[in-house]
Curated annotation (Swiss-Prot):
The chain crosses the membrane at residues 21-41, 48-68, 90-110, 123-143, 164-184. This is Zinc transporter ZitB. It is found in: Cell inner membrane. The gene is zitB. InterPro entries: Cation_efflux, Cation_efflux_CTD_sf, Cation_efflux_TMD_sf, CDF/SLC30A, Zn_transptr_ZitB. Its main location: membrane. The keyword Metal-binding does not apply. The lineage of its organism: Bacteria, Pseudomonadati, Pseudomonadota, Gammaproteobacteria, Enterobacterales. GO terms for molecular function: zinc ion transmembrane transporter activity. Belongs to the cation diffusion facilitator (CDF) transporter (TC 2.A.4) family. SLC30A subfamily. HAMAP family: ZitB. It is a multi-pass membrane protein.
Length: 312
């Protein structure tokens, strides 16, 4: 049998990415604090709910910035994959905090239906418009001259763009209160914004838990990959012991491949590596080639019967 371990060289993030993320984080975090103060002073729950949404933006920007900074640190003997998993842990903690905060806001909104409180619509409007402008500015900072291949910056920009809807919700609530004096618009809009935050937080929680538990990327069908590999490379008779997990943004894979004894081991290994790289963008793979069928009790430990591929 033969082993092969390959990985593509990681390129250091550009400094301009870190600067843009830092500027966007400062703007977003600053206006988040302004919305908290404005929400307390005006009595607007919609502003507080939108501040919670901006908290998700600030956290996403901070995590992206941490990835840029920590990815510059080389792996060590104790941390062989570097420090990328730290951002996943922070995302997990942040997601739990967001769920708790959002549920508290929803509870407060329900209470306000029964015990309405006065809302300063004009102050609420000023703060909400400022928050909207902050989101637009942060999105512009991230989008201008952005590196389309930088997933961190792209994800952060999309996250900020999603928060624009929350700011619009607070503005709509303020307009209704100013024009009609109907204060229930505030808790109604705060609940709608909270639903958006919960949706984002729940997705973040699921993704972070999946990565912390070293789950396979949800976009990758391991059984389909096994069939595809055996179909594209005839020398591969069976693929088993397939494990895929994420380290930061990069997928890592190990697999066993039962192959017809090749004349050139290195050439076959290179073909398998090229297949994984070009078809599935997996640049970091450890491949064990075997000449005999796997007969151990754990041969199909991590695959369904449909994933068992055997060519006669």
């Amino acid at each position: 049998m033969a082993h092969s371990h390959s990985h593509a060289d990681s390129h250091l993030p550009k400094d301009n990415n870190a600067r843009r993320l830092l500027f966007a984080f400062i703007v977003t975090a600053g206006f988040m604090l302004l919305e908290v103060v404005g929400g307390i002073l005006s009595g607007s729950l919609a502003l507080l709910a939108d501040a919670g949404h901006m908290l998700t933006d600030a956290a996403a920007l901070l995590f992206a910035l941490l990835v840029v900074q920590f990815s510059r640190r080389p792996p060590t003997v104790r941390h062989t994959f570097g420090w990328l998993r730290l951002t996943t842990l922070a995302a997990f903690v942040n997601a739990i905090a967001l769920v708790v905060i959002t549920l508290l806001i929803v509870w407060e909104a329900i209470e306000r239906f029964y015990t309405p409180r006065p809302v300063a619509g004009n102050l609420m409007m000023v703060i909400a418009v400022a928050g909207l402008l902050a989101n637009l500015f942060a999105f512009w900072i991230l989008h201008r001259g952005s590196d389309e291949k930088n997933l961190n910056v792209r994800a952060a920009a999309l996250h900020v763009m999603g928060d624009l809807l929350g700011s619009v919700g607070a503005i709509v609530a303020a307009l209704i209160i100013i024009w009609t004096g109907w204060t229930p618009a505030d808790p109604i809009l705060s609940i709608l914004v909270s639903v958006l935050v919960l949706r984002s937080a729940w997705r973040l929680l699921k993704d972070s838990v999946n990565e912390l538990l070293e789950g396979a990327p949800v976009s990758l069908d391991i059984n389909a990959l096994q069939r595809h590999l055996s179909r594209e490379i005839p020398e591969v008779r069976n693929v088993h012991h397939v494990h895929v997990w994420m380290v930061g943004e990069k997928p890592v894979m190990t697999l066993h491949a039962q192959v017809i004894p090749p004349h050139d081991h290195d050439a076959l290994l290179e073909r398998i590596q090229d297949f994984l790289m070009h078809e599935y963008h997996i640049a970091h793979a450890t491949i064990q080639m075997e000449y005999q069928m796997c007969h151990g009790p754990d041969c199909h430990l991590n695959q369904t019967p449909s994933g068992h591929v055997h060519h006669h």
